[in-house]
């Protein structure tokens, strides 16, 4: 049997072996606060997927906009009351070609509630152009993967 064929068979065997399926199991959504707290404190690579349409606009009963996104939790704080706080920021350009800085912050409460805040800033003056806040739940609107 040619060497490249043997290498292909070996690669396929490793790729599809039961040992390689462990990563898929570890990447399942994790629906509770305690598991999330343990994951961040253990230094796990945590990602959040958010679906704002499954959340509510803060202080209202209206659903959020049909926007989905994800982020990797690079830094976090577990505060004295147990709140897990993390944030991200990025520079982007709006559809009208206006450059903006977007600051997104999240707070995960011990009861499984997730508060999502977004602030859009003028990149030259840091003036606030728009703010919005949403209330989500772990497993409904906000899912965590590690």
Task: Kindly give the residue locations of the regions a language model identified.
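N-terminal secretory signal peptides
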Residues: 25-94, 126-127, 145
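Positively charged, low-complexity intrinsically disordered regions
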Residues: 4, 23-24
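Bacterial N-terminal signal peptides that target proteins for export
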Residues: 1-11
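C-terminal segment of classical bacterial N-terminal signal peptides
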Residues: 14-23
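Exposed, low-complexity/repetitive linear segments and helix-based recognition motifs
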Residues: 24-25, 99
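Acidic, glycine-rich flexible loop segments
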Residues: 88-146
